[in-house]
C-alpha cells in the first residue's frame, strides 16, 4: 500500500449525491486528510460541483462512470449489469490495485454484493462486513457485523 491512501468515493451514491458527497471529500482534503480522493461518477456533473470549492486539485481525481445504481434496483443484478456505474468502476479500481479503499453512501445491498462479486473477500473473512455510521446530533456510534 502506498504512503498516501487512495480512496475511491462513489460520488453518485446516496440521497444527497453528488453535492454532499463532493462537499465531504473536499472538506476532508482541506482538513488535512492524508489521502488521494478518487471521485467516481458522471465527470461533467462532478467537475461542475468541484468548481464551487477551493482545494488542492492534486489530491482529488475524477474518474468518469456513466451509470448509477439506485436503492430501488436488485443489488446483484445491478452490479452485474451496470459495469460502468460509479460503484462498480470504483470496486474495480480497488480490485486492480488502483485504489486502496472505497466509500459509498449508495445502496447497501449493491455495496455488499459488489464487494463480494467484484473485489472478493479477504482470506479468513467468512461473511462480508458492513459498517454503517448511524449518527445523531450528540454522538456517533460505530457498529460492525463482520465475522472473522
Protein language model regions, located:
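Conserved small/polar residues in nucleotide/adenosyl-binding loops
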Residues: 138-144
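Proline-rich intrinsically disordered, low-complexity coils
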Residues: 18, 129-132, 143
